[in-house]
A protein has these predicted regions:
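Phosphate/diphosphate ligand-binding glycine-rich loop within oxidoreductases
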Residues: 2-118, 228, 233-234
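Conserved hydrophobic helix-helix packing surfaces used for dimerization/oligomerization
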Residues: 12, 125-126, 149, 221
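Glycine-rich adenosine-cofactor-binding loop
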Residues: 16, 100-105, 112, 116, ...
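Short, well-ordered coil/turn residues at beta-beta hairpins
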Residues: 63, 195-196, 224
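Rossmann-fold NAD(P) dinucleotide-binding segment
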Residues: 69, 199-222, 231-234
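Active-site rim beta-loop-alpha module in soluble metabolic enzymes
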Residues: 152-161, 165-166, 178-206
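Rossmann-fold NAD(P)-binding glycine/threonine-rich loop
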Residues: 220-264
Length: 264
């Protein structure tokens, strides 16, 4: 999409709150090699942050908690964005229209693919924990990659609504389950994407059988939160003692893959 040929081309940034911990500026500044500015726009109010984008920036990345609000502002949305119902990229076209894209799902697909080896026997069930913007992108990614996708969220209605939209929009194999089914699907899943900012009590109630899994031992556990993960090193060590085939994938891998997608 052609951008306005003026000084706005030189200025990029990130909106969200809080974002002082974000690694995005370092990643994008390295990629741009000093040619463009990349700012953290750390404003708690979405409308104020969005106005700053309109006034000063050509393209912005969007992170929590603004992905849904930013999506609502777009004049044109990509197919991926439409399916996810959230955006992590907003850009201005030369005619002034705002275009929304989403590279979060590329982050999920890339991080999972990087950690699956040919000899791994892995269940084609994916468990997505949460139903915010990151979880929606994760569910879309696993659906596109051929996984039977189960979304579990504290607000069951929200998860059910999104699962239905995935089925209707893309004919995907997606469903929602209540939190009471967490241990069952942790056991059945080959891929688990954990997007909640907190360590939920259901994690502490997993049995050894749940962690070992069926029908095969290999599991990919991808966590969205790279700054303050819900799984400590000790947690991962405990899980791996029970299931040596469990691979924990840090949120930084997700971030890196989505940043590459956003940069492109």
């Amino acid at each position: 999409t052609p951008l306005a040929r003026n000084n706005l081309m030189k200025k990029f940034g990130l909106i969200g709150y809080p974002i002082s911990h974000s690694l995005s500026p370092a990643l994008f500044k390295a990629a741009y090699n000093g040619k463009y500015i990349y700012d953290l726009i750390e404003i708690e109010d979405f409308e104020t942050a969005y106005q700053k984008f309109l006034d000063e920036y050509a393209v912005i990345n969007v992170t929590a908690p603004f992905k849904g609000s930013a999506f609502q502002k777009a004049d044109i949305v990509s197919e991926d964005c439409k399916a996810i119902g959230a955006t992590n990229i907003l850009m201005k076209r030369e005619d002034g229209k705002i275009v929304a894209g989403n590279s979060d799902h590329l982050g999920v697909s890339g991080a999972i693919a990087d950690n699956i080896t040919p000899e791994m026997s892995i269940s084609k069930v994916a468990l997505i924990v949460g139903c915010g913007g990151a979880a929606k992108a994760a569910a879309y990614a696993t659906c596109k990659d051929g996984y039977s996708t189960v979304i579990i969220n504290r607000n069951f209605g929200k998860a059910q609504e999104f699962a239905e939209s995935l089925k209707n929009l893309g004919g995907f194999d997606a469903k929602a389950e209540p939190m009471s089914e967490f241990s069952r699907y942790f056991r059945e899943a080959g891929v688990i994407v954990y997007t909640l900012p907190l360590h939920i009590p259901a994690l502490d109630q997993l049995s050894e059988e749940d962690i070992k899994g069926v029908p095969s031992a290999a599991k990919i556990l991808l966590e969205a939160n790279y700054k303050d993960p819900s799984f400590s090193k000790e947690d991962i060590e405990e899980l791996r003692k029970i299931n040596p085939g469990l691979v924990y994938v840090h949120g930084k891998e997700w971030l890196l893959h989505q940043a590459v997608g956003a940069y492109k």
